[in-house]
């Protein structure tokens, strides 16, 4: 945020929380459900991907929380608007084309004032939802299903010039790119390689993708969980990638998100979800300034 604070979504308790420079926490709003990705819109409000809540397993020996399946009594998720001055929470979108949003996960605004968001879906003991990519307007006047189905889509981001949209699929460890034709419209195909997208990387082994940020050089920095938790930095032309592992005391099996801040955007703030921490790491390149 411009004042040097951070906004953090908390899935377990459904809170949108402000983190001060000294680490003090302040409640911004209780959104209920599970607060996942958050972005600031053109009106200065926070737009929240609320996944409707999840079961969590607590590992007492490590003081870790690990995500689980769809909870009992689950009714769905949606997009919420939070007034950062008053804490007022309003549901903006809960349905698309008559279908209830299941578990919105990550969100990014374009320079037109609209936003792309993913719906990750929910898992149950014997099956799970199919997910998708959506586009909405901040005034509540339009929400559109753009790509469906996708395999557990998670992080979403945009290239520095806004000409491409990136989506990470969690369980298969894949990062895709699509060209933007106009706001809410991608150059895609109904058949072929995942709606005609360009595969930038598919991770080997048991490594899963979560949320992302883009740096000023256009590299896509994807939070990674699994056997090699850390940040996977993917070149925008798909020519290769590198992997950053956080050493002690920052080791955590659930590196789930990254954003850039500081006066020169060379500080990476990374969420370590199992241990419930946000850490600041010096980054070799400036991050990409967000549109709002």
Each model region followed by its residue ranges:
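Sequence-structural signature of mature extracellular/luminal beta-sheet repeat domains
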Residues: 1-292
């Amino acid at each position: 945020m411009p004042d040097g604070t951070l906004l953090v979504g908390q899935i377990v308790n459904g809170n949108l929380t402000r983190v001060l420079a000294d680490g003090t926490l302040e409640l911004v709003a209780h959104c209920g459900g599970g607060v996942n990705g958050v972005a600031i819109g053109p009106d200065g409000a926070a737009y929240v991907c609320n996944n409707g809540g999840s079961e969590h397993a607590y590992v007492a020996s490590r003081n870790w929380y690990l995500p689980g399946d769809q909870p009992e009594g689950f009714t769905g998720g949606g997009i919420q608007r939070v007034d950062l001055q008053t804490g007022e929470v309003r549901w903006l979108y809960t349905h698309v084309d008559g279908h209830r949003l299941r578990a919105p996960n990550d969100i990014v605004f374009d320079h037109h004032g609209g936003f792309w968001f993913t719906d990750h879906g929910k898992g149950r003991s014997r099956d799970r939802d199919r997910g998708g990519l959506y586009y909405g307007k901040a005034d509540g006047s339009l929400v559109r299903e753009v790509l469906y189905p996708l395999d557990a889509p998670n992080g979403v981001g945009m290239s520095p010039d806004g000409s491409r949209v990136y989506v990470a699929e969690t369980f298969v460890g894949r990062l895709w790119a699509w060209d933007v034709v106009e706001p809410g419209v991608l150059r895609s195909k109904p058949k072929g390689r995942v709606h005609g997208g360009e595969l930038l990387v598919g991770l080997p082994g048991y490594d899963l993708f979560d949320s992302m940020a883009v740096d000023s050089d256009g590299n896509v920095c994807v939070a990674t969980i699994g056997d090699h938790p850390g940040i996977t930095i993917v070149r925008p032309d798909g020519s290769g990638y590198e992997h950053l592992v956080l050493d002690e005391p920052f080791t955590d099996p659930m590196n789930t998100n990254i954003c850039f801040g500081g006066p020169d955007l060379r500080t990476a703030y990374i969420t370590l979800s199992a241990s419930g921490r946000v850490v600041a790491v010096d980054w070799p390149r400036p991050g990409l300034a967000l549109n709002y």
